[in-house]
Amino acid sequence: MIIRRSSFISALLLIDSSRLHHASGFSSIQPPHRVAGTGTGMSPSATTRLDAATALLSLGDSAKAVVAVAPVAPSAGAISDPTKVGVLLLNLGGPETGEDVEGFLYNLFADPDIIRLPPLLAPLQSLVALVISKRRAPKSREAYDSIGGGSPILQYTRAQADLMVDSLRERHGVEAKAYIGMRYWYPFTEEALDDIRKDGINALVILPMYPQFSISTSGSSLRVLQEEFAKRSDLYGPQKMFHTVIPSWYDRPGYVRSVANLIRRELDSFTPEEIEEGTSELQPVPRHVLFSAHGVPASYIEAGDPYRDQILDCVGRISALLPSEEEGVKVHLSFQSRVGPVEWLRPYTDDVLPSLGEQGVKNLVVVPISFVSEHIETLEEIDIEYRELALESGITNWRRSPALNTDASFINEMADMVAEALNEPSQSITEACVANNVGNLALESVSSQMEISSAGVGGVGYDDDLAGRARRLRKDRYSRTILKRGD
């Protein structure tokens, strides 16, 4: 659903909040020439495969150049011979039942890395989050009801954690214990840290379950850890526990191959009859692949968020392992889940699908490139909403590449990442944040670019009970207001 409102708060009240996973942003698009971190640049074939997609991704002449990120030297010394290894998987979290939805939405909107109010309105963040979550909860519950009543993200993350531990042991001889820290719902990151402390972990690998780094996903989770580590250096300082962060891993060969293999499986499923149906004078290429990445507003990229470049690089690497256009496969890239009145990264998925239909595309594989497990944005937004739009647009043969979930090659790649991190110079949370411009956002927030309605909170009144809840909400030790079950 496209939302265009002059009032920022009014627009927020219409957000399908169950789909808002991160809000970072983009400016002018240029193909990446070099891979961030370790590794080399993209191959010429990968860059060529993305030419068409890159040409689509323009925000106009007003877009600003991306802020360059200066590399940060890693900490001296590597983690050697740890006695108790822990792996902390960071993820978004999601409501497990309908009763959890409102609390989950509140925590999402109360995060200033997701919704940034202008400085003068920042003290109202908790109240705004309460109003939005209360208003949006019924519709969001309907979305979750359509996929079984709750998010499966925790189930998949637990399965990934368990299998990764097994792979670490079998492939690398490393005994480790995995912990899960969710940003917006149980088990919260703070709970994971308590367990890590109680278990006496002295070497911790921090692995965000987001292949591409964004200030509002991996960055937001790392902020929580950074604040906790700073406040409790007696528990988490270098004298007690070494830690190292894997900030992004979109360019890992095992990850790239895993995604490409799943796409190939879907491409191979088109029958000869469907191939014939998809070939015409209007559309000579019979099979098409649409990478649908989570979109983000432009202002974050202008502040240095590397997410856009990493998406482009990632799609280029995967595309290089797929059949070429001469071999009957054409690649496209779009961005989904935009909300509110500000400019987001283009082209939008709900614009691209009708356009592909007009071009005579009949056979399409949609790839949820930002996600490593099924959740509301794959199971409801893509599988239900976008599928219906595609069929209405004349794309008769629809396929969706599954998320990686517990794919064996992906699990092994997770284990390999952790094992390598234990034997390489460590990268601290602070270094990871600085290297990816976390905390480098301009004081002018996303919302400061929008007109604030003078009619109050989007014209929606709030009663004394709601205001009282805002005042009574307890703050955790990091001065972040969070809502938990029973609040």
Segments the model singles out, each with a brief description of its role:
Residues L56-D487:
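Active-site-proximal alpha-helix that buttresses catalytic centers in soluble enzyme cores
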